Amino acid sequence: MFGFLKQVGDYTRDAVDAARNLTQGLAVTFDHMKRRPVTVQYPYEKLIPSERYRGRIHYEFDKCIACEVCVRVCPINLPVVDWVMNKETKKKELRNYSIDFGVCIFCGNCVEYCPTNCLSMTEEYELAAFDRHSLNFDNVALGRLPTSVTTDPAVQPLRELAYLPAGEVQPHGVDPSRPRAGQRPDQVLSSLKQNAGGSAGNEGESATSTNTSKGSAE
């Protein structure tokens, strides 16, 4: 008898523990359901990186002193610094500087330890290429100003067409009652047609009212 009661007690305790664990898991799931969707319609929608995002490295040739600190602090000794010694001034003269982004791990050590701040991280993250050799950027390519996501010509016209309405595109920290930050192309076309039809209807109504007012005046 006591053995049966013990089994019932153990079963009840296990059932309560299982229900508690299930409730905790569902609480986490329901918490995520309150958040906005994370998936975006790339490349028509692009997430704006944070200020500390580590993207493509920007390089300023005029500030570089060829000290090779970036090479020493790099975990894989990636930067290639080509310089010669000027016998007259007894100083280094920089000839070329290159970084292969196909190998770079974007740790940011070169930017952090550069004594002249000639290296900086940008928000540019679209570095895909068909040829891996094209990812080896020289000082000219590294000196190119980065393309900002907010001023991307492929996104800006769609932003004006209400594809990306004003507001944050970040999924968290936004009022859940607000509509999704972005519409699909068919929704954009339908909204544009509705706006065009509404404006045409308003013009027709204004023209009818004008004719009516003229007739009453006569």
Curated annotation (Swiss-Prot):
<dbReference type="GO" id="GO:0005506">
    <property type="term" value="F:iron ion binding"/>
</dbReference>
<keyword id="KW-0874">Quinone</keyword>
<keyword id="KW-0521">NADP</keyword>
<keyword id="KW-0677">Repeat</keyword>
<dbReference type="GO" id="GO:0008137">
    <property type="term" value="F:NADH dehydrogenase (ubiquinone) activity"/>
</dbReference>
<feature type="binding site">
    <location>
        <position position="114"/>
    </location>
    <ligand>
        <name>[4Fe-4S] cluster 1</name>
    </ligand>
</feature>
<dbReference type="Pfam" id="PF12838">
    <property type="entry name" value="Fer4_7"/>
</dbReference>
<keyword id="KW-0472">Membrane</keyword>
<dbReference type="GO" id="GO:0019684">
    <property type="term" value="P:photosynthesis, light reaction"/>
</dbReference>
<dbReference type="InterPro" id="IPR010226">
    <property type="entry name" value="NADH_quinone_OxRdtase_chainI"/>
</dbReference>
<dbReference type="GO" id="GO:0048038">
    <property type="term" value="F:quinone binding"/>
</dbReference>
<feature type="binding site">
    <location>
        <position position="110"/>
    </location>
    <ligand>
        <name>[4Fe-4S] cluster 2</name>
    </ligand>
</feature>
<comment type="subunit">
    <text>NDH-1 is composed of at least 11 different subunits.</text>
</comment>
<feature type="binding site">
    <location>
        <position position="70"/>
    </location>
    <ligand>
        <name>[4Fe-4S] cluster 1</name>
    </ligand>
</feature>
<dbReference type="GO" id="GO:0031676">
    <property type="term" value="C:plasma membrane-derived thylakoid membrane"/>
</dbReference>
<keyword id="KW-0793">Thylakoid</keyword>
<feature type="binding site">
    <location>
        <position position="67"/>
    </location>
    <ligand>
        <name>[4Fe-4S] cluster 1</name>
    </ligand>
</feature>
<comment type="function">
    <text>NDH-1 shuttles electrons from an unknown electron donor, via FMN and iron-sulfur (Fe-S) centers, to quinones in the respiratory and/or the photosynthetic chain. The immediate electron acceptor for the enzyme in this species is believed to be plastoquinone. Couples the redox reaction to proton translocation, and thus conserves the redox energy in a proton gradient.</text>
</comment>
<feature type="binding site">
    <location>
        <position position="104"/>
    </location>
    <ligand>
        <name>[4Fe-4S] cluster 2</name>
    </ligand>
</feature>
<feature type="domain" description="4Fe-4S ferredoxin-type 2">
    <location>
        <begin position="95"/>
        <end position="124"/>
    </location>
</feature>
<keyword id="KW-0004">4Fe-4S</keyword>
<feature type="domain" description="4Fe-4S ferredoxin-type 1">
    <location>
        <begin position="55"/>
        <end position="84"/>
    </location>
</feature>
<feature type="binding site">
    <location>
        <position position="64"/>
    </location>
    <ligand>
        <name>[4Fe-4S] cluster 1</name>
    </ligand>
</feature>
<keyword id="KW-1278">Translocase</keyword>
<feature type="region of interest" description="Disordered">
    <location>
        <begin position="168"/>
        <end position="218"/>
    </location>
</feature>
<keyword id="KW-0479">Metal-binding</keyword>
<feature type="binding site">
    <location>
        <position position="74"/>
    </location>
    <ligand>
        <name>[4Fe-4S] cluster 2</name>
    </ligand>
</feature>
<dbReference type="GO" id="GO:0051539">
    <property type="term" value="F:4 iron, 4 sulfur cluster binding"/>
</dbReference>
<protein>
    <recommendedName>
        <fullName>NAD(P)H-quinone oxidoreductase subunit I</fullName>
        <ecNumber>7.1.1.-</ecNumber>
    </recommendedName>
</protein>
<keyword id="KW-0520">NAD</keyword>
<dbReference type="InterPro" id="IPR004497">
    <property type="entry name" value="NDHI"/>
</dbReference>
<feature type="compositionally biased region" description="Polar residues">
    <location>
        <begin position="208"/>
        <end position="218"/>
    </location>
</feature>
<keyword id="KW-0411">Iron-sulfur</keyword>
<feature type="binding site">
    <location>
        <position position="107"/>
    </location>
    <ligand>
        <name>[4Fe-4S] cluster 2</name>
    </ligand>
</feature>
<dbReference type="InterPro" id="IPR017900">
    <property type="entry name" value="4Fe4S_Fe_S_CS"/>
</dbReference>
<keyword id="KW-0408">Iron</keyword>
<comment type="similarity">
    <text>Belongs to the complex I 23 kDa subunit family.</text>
</comment>
<keyword id="KW-0618">Plastoquinone</keyword>
<dbReference type="InterPro" id="IPR017896">
    <property type="entry name" value="4Fe4S_Fe-S-bd"/>
</dbReference>
